[in-house]
């Protein structure tokens, strides 16, 4: 179900908008946002 919602979002939103949103998140300097993204990345890709 989670995958279906993700794919639906990708088809409904313009790809350029998704790329820009991802870029904004990647450049974010707000500590709690930045740290949350780093932790999620490390957990997802099993980084030690």
Curated annotation (Swiss-Prot):
UniProt key word Lipid metabolism: yes
Cofactor(s) needed for function: pyruvate
GO biological process: phosphatidylethanolamine biosynthetic process
Annotated catalysed reactions: a 1,2-diacyl-sn-glycero-3-phospho-L-serine + H(+) = a 1,2-diacyl-sn-glycero-3-phosphoethanolamine + CO2
UniProt pathway: Phospholipid metabolism; phosphatidylethanolamine biosynthesis; phosphatidylethanolamine from CDP-diacylglycerol: step 2/2
Protein name as annotated: Phosphatidylserine decarboxylase proenzyme
Family designation: Belongs to the phosphatidylserine decarboxylase family. Type 1 subfamily.
Gene Ontology molecular function: any one: phosphatidylserine decarboxylase activity
Keywords: Decarboxylase, Lipid biosynthesis, Lipid metabolism, Lyase, Phospholipid biosynthesis, Phospholipid metabolism, Pyruvate
EC nos: 4.1.1.65
Cofactor binding description: Binds 1 pyruvoyl group covalently per subunit.
């Amino acid at each position: 179900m989670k995958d279906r919602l993700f794919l639906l979002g990708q088809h409904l939103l313009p790809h350029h908008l998704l790329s820009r949103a991802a870029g904004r998140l990647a450049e974010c300097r707000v500590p709690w946002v930045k740290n949350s993204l780093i932790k999620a990345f490390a957990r997802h890709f099993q980084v030690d």
